[in-house]
Amino acid sequence: MSLSQNAIFKSQTGEENLMSSNHRDSESITDVCSNEDLPEVELVNLLEEQLPQYKLRVDSLFLYENQDWSQSSHQQQDASETLSPVLAEETFRYMILGTDRVEQMTKTYNDIDMVTHLLAERDRDLELAARIGQALLKRNHVLSEQNESLEEQLGQAFDQVNQLQHELSKKEELLRIVSIASEESETDSSCSTPLRFNESFSLSQGLLQLDMMHEKLKELEEENMALRSKACHIKTETFTYEEKEQKLINDCVNELRETNAQMSRMTEELSGKSDELLRYQEEISSLLSQIVDLQHKLKEHVIEKEELRLHLQASKDAQRQLTMELHELQDRNMECLGMLHESQEEIKELRNKAGPSAHLCFSQAYGVFAGESLAAEIEGTMRKKLSLDEESVFKQKAQQKRVFDTVKVANDTRGRSVTFPVLLPIPGSNRSSVIMTAKPFESGVQQTEDKTLPNQGSSTEVPGNSHPRDPPGLPEDSDLATALHRLSLRRQNYLSEKQFFAEEWERKLQILAEQEEEVSSCEALTENLASFCTDQSETTELGSAGCLRGFMPEKLQIVKPLEGSQTLHHWQQLAQPNLGTILDPRPGVITKGFTQMPKDAVYHISDLEEDEEVGITFQVQQPLQLEQKPAPPPPVTGIFLPPMTSAGGPVSVATSNPGKCLSFTNSTFTFTTCRILHPSDITQVTPSSGFPSLSCGSSAGSASNTAVNSPAASYRLSIGESITNRRDSTITFSSTRSLAKLLQERGISAKVYHSPASENPLLQLRPKALATPSTPPNSPSQSPCSSPVPFEPRVHVSENFLASRPAETFLQEMYGLRPSRAPPDVGQLKMNLVDRLKRLGIARVVKTPVPRENGKSREAEMGLQKPDSAVYLNSGGSLLGGLRRNQSLPVMMGSFGAPVCTTSPKMGILKED
């Protein structure tokens, strides 16, 4: 037993030596005896993965040759102390080294993470093996301690047995000695001889010792056999324990391998689960982003839905409001039609009483003046007016109303036949004698139809004129043929629609017959609406007797057809809306009381750059020498007075018309005609007042109201009864509707321009005032004199009137140029004038005219005005700011009381040539 333990300890010591010498594989033969020359025990250590195998060599014949097998307990205790825990730990660490991890590391040496993982697993396995080895070492240590204690007990038992054997042998010897002594005494008593007794005693004692030695030998042999059997049993038990320990270690290693394999599989599964988890997280993040986007879209759709709902509600409200306004306008339209019906009936009655008055148009050539002169026409007209009684006055009014009816029907027909109105000159005169002396700006258009449009109206007078002239600007034969063809087409269109108008008028009369009670409360407006009546029979008669009057004039250019006068045609050309050059001097046009501006012209930064900053100059042909005859007799001179009726009595000629001597002067009375759209409707005719007078209040509080001293004023007395469109936002205080009246009722004021002509002492006596229209003769109320209204001029205005649409339109008509811009659409033309003026920044001053007493009439307010006054309308923001893109021209006929000029910072001071 002690030998095997010593061999194990020797082998472990040899393994430690081998490990300390660079782990060389070798065999170590260790003798268990003290003699090194006797290799009885050979220990062979196989450096393998398993535990070292030990081979014990013993002599089978003699069993052993020396007594070293039995060692003392002290030596065994010393041998047990040679095993240290460090040696045992190193031994176990060396034993758990295997090749499995080496193979794995060689397979995965390229993967750093896997190698690190295997190294970590190896460290954990080594730690586990070390802990198991430590546990086994502790168990082995306990077993070795138990073995040592058992060996000590066995030695003590051997000592006790030896001691007992020695005592037993001593006792046996004593017993033998006692027995021998007793036998000898017995023999002595039998009288034997002493010699023989002594020999026998020595012999028996020798035999007894021999027997004792044999017995002792047998006992020792038996004891040796028992010890040998016990040693073999201990050896077998040791081998059994070693086998169990090896099996346990193998089981631990196998379990470790299985555990490592399971851990590797679990690691792979964990990596797969981690990848799947990452994929799930990405899917979750994408789904969350989609959810956020869908929520954002949902919010946007909700907001859009709310906005659409609000828009729908606003549209419904606007539709309801427009429906209500439409019903209201329909009611007012029916009311106006009723009043129109009554007015037409009244006009028919007056016309039946008056009788034919066609001779007025042809009596103008029998005066003292030339047949084609304007003075002769005016003289004949005034003579007929003075010779007519009250019945002739009614006939004249009826005829003039028929003229307006003709123009109304022609305008309506042309408005339906032409989508966009072509700007034409006012017809009713002979060939044009107007020559353009300068072009203020270039519109960038080609002069393809030179002087075609201004002469379309004059071409209609060729058959009835026996003295045709050939002034500059005469159109060619092709242009005349084109103009005649256009006029014939328009005439045919008008005749084709005559029947439709008649049927439509009959239907309206039937509708208006039911509303006579409602119309009875609007008698004042009935007379104002009389000019809208459309008598088809009278229109046909007048169209046939007017020398090709089938020509449909421009909308709102309402003039009476005066035939055969160069001066009248020049008036019509001057009536075109070119207010930008109204301050420029013209040959043949003398403006009394007007002084020229200084030579040093003042320019502004806001003015547009032009080649020549001069206005459009007209050259008017001088009248014949027949017009410069001596003054007519006093009864003839009175024909220049229009028939005025006032409550205070007739107005004297000398006081009311100081500048009546027209035959001795070359004065030309200019009617500035323009056309403006009604703020609410473009489809209805909106004629302005024929002769709006200016009520100018003086500093002393007195007003000097004068009548019109124009030669053509006698033809225009009834034009003041024109009608303006009614709309729900306009309060009608009078039937006379001029541009100044319309702007004032809309709250738009104009600033009075202080021209250099105001330095004249005669002109300085007149205060600054605005043009306030007065009521017509048939109006029950009259408008008072308005006080000067403050005006706030616009700032940052960079537009010039010469670049505006009316000026360009005038140049197109005079030069026959093509328009440089595309014609505006109907939606743009329907824009309200008031909205345009408001958009341009015109100062808004709400001033409502106060109606006067009912006892007065317009003739009482008006008187003959001084001819030394001129009308100047600038292109500032007050009047023409909203007309620059409007090609329709409102009619403004008559003479104003004072030189009222509107100005703006953009026009500056015009330079004179």
Swiss-Prot record:
Compositionally biased tracts (Low complexity): 688-704, 780-789
Domain HAP1 N-terminal as annotated: residue spans: 48-353
InterPro entries linked: HAP1_N, Intracell_Traff-Reg, TRAK1/2_C
GO cellular component: axonal growth cone; cytoplasm; cytoplasmic vesicle; dendrite; dendrite cytoplasm; early endosome; mitochondrion; neuronal cell body
Pfam families in UniProt: HAP1_N, Milton
Role: May regulate endosome-to-lysosome trafficking of membrane cargo, including EGFR.
Assembly mode: Interacts with RHOT1/Miro-1 and RHOT2/Miro-2. Interacts with GABA-A receptor and O-GlcNAc transferase. Interacts with HGS.
The protein, known as: Trafficking kinesin-binding protein 2
Lineage: Eukaryota, Metazoa, Chordata, Craniata, Vertebrata
Gene designation per UniProt: Trak2
